[in-house]
From Swiss-Prot:
It comes from Talaromyces stipitatus (strain ATCC 10500 / CBS 375.48 / QM 6759 / NRRL 1006). Its main location: cytoplasm. GO terms for molecular function: structural constituent of ribosome. This is Small ribosomal subunit protein uS2. Keywords: Cytoplasm, Ribonucleoprotein, Ribosomal protein. SUPFAM superfamilies: Ribosomal protein S2. The keyword Transmembrane helix does not apply. Residues 263-290 are annotated as: Disordered. The keyword Transferase does not apply. One of its GO terms (cellular component) is cytosolic small ribosomal subunit. Residues 263-282 have a biased composition (Low complexity). PANTHER family: 40S RIBOSOMAL PROTEIN SA (PTHR11489).
Amino acid sequence: MAPSNLPPVFNATSQDIEMLLAAQCHLGSKNLQVHMEPYLWKTRPDGINVINIGKTWEKIVLAARIIAAIDNPADVAVISARPYGQRAVLKFASHTGATAIAGRFTPGNFTNYITRSFKEPRLIIVTDPRTDAQAIKEASYVNIPVIALCDTDSPTEFVDVAIPTNNKGRHAIGLVWWLLAREVLRLRGTLATRETEWDVVVDLYFYRDPEAEETKEIADESKVPGAEEVGPAAIETGYVGDSWDAAAPGAAAPGSAFAAASATAGATWEAEAGGDWAAESAQPNPETKW
């Protein structure tokens, strides 16, 4: 995918290209900003602008080389006000040592030194130039370079390196941050080559809805296996749940041992009583006054 005048190390693997296409990183919006035209491949009949995925990979490599050139990893600030990118920037920060700002960007973070959250990064990376406009604006005041994930309709003012990609889908955002982190680690020497398997899966960078996860856990807990799932043989032997092994030979149903013990105890009590209870009771004294 790299031009012929660049070394082969810039070439993307077929797996990387397939992942970018599967995550729909090439699908832009219906609007096109004039500065994003060089990254456009074509416009579909339905009006969707398709991004050149080769340009996306070139900009990921360029951005990674800029990040790796900074001596102190903590001087890189990764920012995402969009919920779909907050998990990705936190994971990127934990793997590369950058400083993450997930959620609302406090005005004055880069310009007001009196605030407790004041920072002086050497580079910032934003997920969306539109939602992270405050961070880009303050970075322009203090001459901080900006790398941004830009869609076809994203404003590119004060953006130094634009990575053309779909910045609205959760999978596209997570994959680009994952590829960027992997490329930074490769340049730092943590990973030997791109073909080296990274033990961090891309799913960790994807956004996960907390409410959906709670609903899924509740549904899994309340689910009880039915006869179709367990089988008729287990039902006949007394299977009522998943707390005992129905496949074990001679397995007894839960509660059968307690019922047998209760029956034995009842027989013992009758043997000990052995007589008429009414005959053993003392006759009341007729002269007693109550």
